[in-house]
Amino acid sequence: MVANADVKKLYGISILGLLLSAFTVYLFPSYFILILPTLVLIVGLFLLSIENIFLIVAFSTPFSIKYLFGNSGLNLPDEPLMIVLMLLFIVKLIEKPPLFKPILKESLTFVLILNLIWILLTSITSSLPIVSFKFLLARLWTVTFGYFWGALIFKNPKNIKKFMLAFGLGLCIVVIYSTYNHYGVGFSQKKAMLVMKPLMDDHTVYSAVCSMVLAFSITMLFFKNRFYTKILFYGIALCSLTGVILSYSRAAALSLVFVTIFLILLKLKIRFRTLVSFIGVLIIFGFIFNNEIYQRIRLNNSASGKNLVGDIKSISNVNNDESNVERLNRWESGFRMFKEKPLLGFGPGTYQFQYSGYQKSQQMTSISTTHGDMGNAHSEYFGPLIESGIVGFLLVILLFGFSIAILMNLYYHPKDEKTKMYSLAILLSLLTYYFHGLMNDFLDQDKAAVLVWAMLGMVTSLNLNQSNISESLEKV
């Protein structure tokens, strides 16, 4: 798919990267490890195609390890490879704009570009510009890799399957590693959040990624595929399910329940408009009866940490479940921040460094912090609202909403069985993340970001491949 001349240009970019890495190592010997991914890329390009490098990144992302230098860090080996591919994308976009023209015309791409532009604007006005521009750069290389390169590479639908197999097999390594560590501590629930380190930060992102891969893999088992492909997806599904169960993550368990209910509605041919209307009605009722709902929740004293059923019951316990109380503390602190800067927000990536001053002592818990070292807003929706204002929030809603609408349309009106299979698998997988995003946010971490942006790239490529592309989404 990629011409020899383009590969030669990537060689040049890679060699330049190698020289820059060597210069960095010469000045700062402790950063020697930075040279390794560039070497891997150059050697790989002499043996493989760009498509295979793409799959290597997918495979290595789940078990990549963060290497810190100063106040910054890179996940190795995947992020340096994504940076090189981002540079190549810029070169190709300038030299061969027609290659990406169909992708750039897609509605999902339009919303995504608006989102990136708004992140740039709010980085300029940020309360911590350096933090925000680091956030923007990391977002750019994951979006470029997963979405733009993905949309191009996934034009061959077989590459969707290859990508998910590569990522899933990489995730199996993490699950086996985590399960072995967990076994060593007697499968303790308290230790569950630590056993995947240093491959993943904690059990929340681990469970979110496992849920996404599980939903995709199980869907693939119910469609026609080659025997060995089904065996691979069966093994990946088994590993992912093990990861979800042993993570003791309430959000992950609920996200899988949610997609099961959604699948039933999908089989009943629910329209996208009906779905949006239903969600709108729920939100309105939530506002009208918020006091009654709060009083009901206030009576819940179910504690987490005993078993999965108890964990799920404890989700609405805002009295003595420390995790829930701390989440409310962060959300209320964030809401005070939003009221102060509703339009532009505090800047992308700044919440964890700024929210401490907006906490109230009576709402803080033993796990609260005032040092900006204990995570973010715990919501994929609330975070952008605080950091990029109301416009940033709406753009995230539009991006997620458009992807659901397109996938539902593809599922209801597929050009062939494979389109139906992939659209359903991607839809259910993304929905686990969108639901999980109500309580956590991971798009600033490569483990989830690569998977989410790649799946959105799959959405665009499937939509471009659809023969009846002019068919209106209003039919959904």
Where do the PLM segments sit?
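Long extracytoplasmic/lumenal interhelical loops at the membrane interface
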Residues: 187-192, 317-332, 336, 340, ...
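A membrane-periplasm/extracellular boundary helix in multi-pass inner-membrane enzymes
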Residues: 4-6, 26, 182, 242, ...
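N-terminal signal-anchor transmembrane segment
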Residues: 6-94, 121-125
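Aromatic-anchored transmembrane helix interface
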Residues: 78-83, 107-119, 129-152, 171
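Membrane-interfacial loop-to-transmembrane alpha-helix junctions, especially the N-terminal start
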Residues: 46-57, 101-113, 160-167, 232-233, ...
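Membrane helix-loop boundary segments at the extracytoplasmic
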Residues: 59, 64-70, 381-388, 421-461
